[in-house]
Amino acid sequence: MRNVWLIVPFALLAAFSGETWAQADRDLYIDSTESSGNYPVDDDDYSSGSGSGIPAHDDDEDNVVLTTVQTLISSPSSEMPYVDTTTLKTQTKMAPETKEPGEVESTNTVLVHENKNIIQTATHTENLFHRTEVLAAVIAGGGIGFLFAVFLILLLVYRMRKKDEGSYDLGERKPSSAVYQKAPTKEFYA
């Protein structure tokens, strides 16, 4: 009966505190749901925006731009005719490639200098261990783990040596002094 009287107040406390939390949750948002940004679903703009819907043009075709620049020298002679420069720029769009599990970031950068017609390509492939902060954390963790292992081995060796010396308490009881009593030296002749 005593257990029932202990359980009843706790059950009532739980019921009233649950109701209080529900009331506090309702009082948290004073405004209506529309002013808080909770609108009904609007599917009118389903295909608009970046990366949604079917694209208007095909991304698999190559875009080729042909540029012809004629540079005329001020006075053409038989030694120096005019120069006809043709520049062919090709932009190829490729399908996105999936990353390997260990690879974090892969970026391709193409730098084009228009006046010198020099194209430089830089490729950055970076996996998890090429990042300096991850590498520093792995090295620090390995060092701390190594020190912990050395400390543990030294502690075990210390305890083994102490046990061999006999000063280590193994929990064994010493025999009482009554066991080591000297035998009587009196001799009885019968």
Swiss-Prot record:
Intrachain S-S bonds: none
Q: Which residues are glycosylated?
A: 36, 48, 50, 52
Q: Which residues face the membrane's Extracellular side?
A: 23-136
Q: Does the keyword Hydrolase apply?
A: no
Matches recorded under Pfam families: Syndecan
UniProt topology in membrane: Single-pass type I membrane protein
The residues forming the signal peptide are 1-22
Task: Tell me the residue ranges located in the Cytoplasmic compartment per UniProt.
Answer: 158-190
> Where does this one sit in the cell?
Membrane
Q: Which PANTHER family does this one have?
A: SYNDECAN, SYNDECAN-2
What family does the database annotate? Belongs to the syndecan proteoglycan family.
Per its record, how is this protein called by name? Syndecan-2-B
